[in-house]
Amino acid sequence: MMNDSQVQLFQLYNYSVYSNGTISNFTNCYLINDEHTPIIESDGMIYNGQSCDSPVKSLASHGAVGIVTACFCFFLIPLLLVNIAKYWKGKPPLLKRRMEFIWITLLILALAVGGFAYIDVDRNLVQGAAMKIFSFTFQTALPISIAIIWHVISTYGFALYRQRIVVGKHAAHFSLDHWIFVVEYYAPIVFYVFNLMGFFLAALHPWTKVVRGDGNAATDGRFKASSVLLAIAWVFACAMFIVYSFVYKLDRRGRWVGMVIMMISILPRIVYQFLETWSFTLNASNVSVNAGLVFGLGFCPPLILAYTVCIYGWAVPSIAELEKEAIHEECRQRKRRTTISRDNSTRSTWGIGSEHDMQCLPPSYETMGPCEKEMKEETNEVEIASIESGEVRE
């Protein structure tokens, strides 16, 4: 412990000793106990000082939650890389890439950093930088998660549109002046206004009073307004899913089930945002809060969402693959119809099925698609080869 001369020097520079084993002048704070005893010189310089927010205590429940969260984030990276390799093949322009995976990358970063910072919450005698980092990343994870849902639903809507146009041949029903295109133009602007405002109000809040345990600062109007705005952004994203389902109809492959699971997965986190905003006892920035509550309602929903999106993206074929499959199926059907028509024409030579043949005449070459042109060229080559070999039908 300090001798009397050291105590007088500290008091000369407005330091006060507190019962929790710290000494501070409201600018600098140091631990003072048997293991950590700061030494002050006559000029005010302090040596052997251990900052109050240094992790000196043993690991506890908050640290275990942080470690588990960080591990789940690292396990998610291989799934994310598989999806990036699948959907970014050929390096498409940035605006045409699957933006949900960019947001998932940011979500992994936020949750991992927040998890590591949460480890030191129990180990710090006085909360400081670790709690600030955790609080910032924790509040950042929710708007990022809602942005992921928005882009997944947007991609789903585009997939339904391409399915109706390419596969269903309903291009005439969706002209450029259709109201859905006007909605799709303004909807992202409205969504990001609510989502970004919710982010700026909560994540960019001054954290000094919050980490010191000021319940009024942790539940002030900024956090309440942020909760409402983020909830509106989530509802708006869900509304766009309903609009897409109404206009383009539900996907027969059952992909809409994955959309519903993703939208519901983040709902507990939104509910917890309201709970912690109106009650400091449940607030994640409160060092006394139950760590299991923070993990179950704070960390788990974004992790479940990220895993669901990555597994869904890995299991479901991409839009390009669906269009390629539709084109190949169309080619097979055209070849089958051409073969049937040629067989019927052969039988009509003997007076069989002539009326049916008149209804199955192939289209002119100018109106043929690429598959029909290919079949026509193959037929001509076969007929020329038959003539040259003398195999002409009498």
Swiss-Prot record:
Residue positions with a glycan: N3, N14, N20, N25, N283, N286, N344
4Fe-4S keyword on record: no
Keywords, in A-Z order: Glycoprotein, Membrane, Transmembrane, Transmembrane helix
Source organism superkingdom: Eukaryota
Entry keyword annotation includes NAD: no
Cell compartments where the protein resides: Membrane
TM annotation in the entry: 64-84, 101-121, 133-153, 180-200, 228-248, 256-276, 291-311
Protein name listed in UniProt: Uncharacterized protein C56F8.12
